[in-house]
């Protein structure tokens, strides 16, 4: 029987806090962007909602001690828009795969508010690749069951490998997880 460990609960609680802060700050940034479109002569800057969420967590003491003094590191997309990112640092044997599937579920539900999308799952070596692929394809395994819940059904999850064909229609209608 699978049992989530206390420190995994703490890691996921921190992720939940970050996603909540992102939602709040993104809502505000979206409202500013809408107003700026209606009033272009005001030249309003659009807030970086990701940095604001990070700073909120820092001010609340919710960042890990190892990250609290490190400056915010901005990530942007090709259109110069802020992009949130998450790194979960967990020791060997610490349940990183479980945290990853639980994290995907939370990100899909709490932040993206979608049951469909694309996840690129990168593993460090062939042994972990083989093991992870086996678990993600096994509908009886807790990892796969967490993904099934995130996608609102087992028939809505596609576990893919790099040689598999990726189609936009699949990404729009399924949770596509490509393992590399």
Predicted regions located by residue number:
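RecA-like P-loop NTPase motor core of helicase/translocase proteins
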Residues: 1-180
């Amino acid at each position: 029987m699978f049992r989530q460990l206390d420190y995994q609960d703490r890691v996921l609680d921190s992720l939940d806090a970050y996603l909540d802060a992102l939602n709040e700050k993104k809502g505000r940034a979206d409202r500013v962007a809408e107003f700026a479109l209606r009033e272009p002569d005001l030249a309003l800057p659009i807030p970086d909602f990701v940095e604001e969420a990070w700073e909120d967590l820092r001010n609340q003491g919710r960042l890990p001690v190892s990250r609290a003094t490190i400056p915010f590191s901005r990530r942007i997309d090709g259109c110069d828009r802020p992009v949130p990112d998450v790194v979960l640092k967990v020791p060997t044997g610490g349940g990183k795969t479980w945290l990853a599937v639980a994290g995907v579920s939370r990100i899909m539900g709490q932040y993206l508010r979608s049951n469909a999308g694309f996840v690129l799952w990168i593993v460090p070596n062939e042994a972990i690749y083989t093991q992870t692929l086996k678990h993600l394809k096994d509908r009886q395994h807790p990892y796969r069951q967490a993904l099934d819940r995130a996608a609102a059904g087992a028939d809505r999850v596609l576990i893919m490998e790099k040689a598999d064909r990726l189609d936009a229609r699949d990404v729009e209608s399924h949770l596509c997880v490509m393992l590399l």
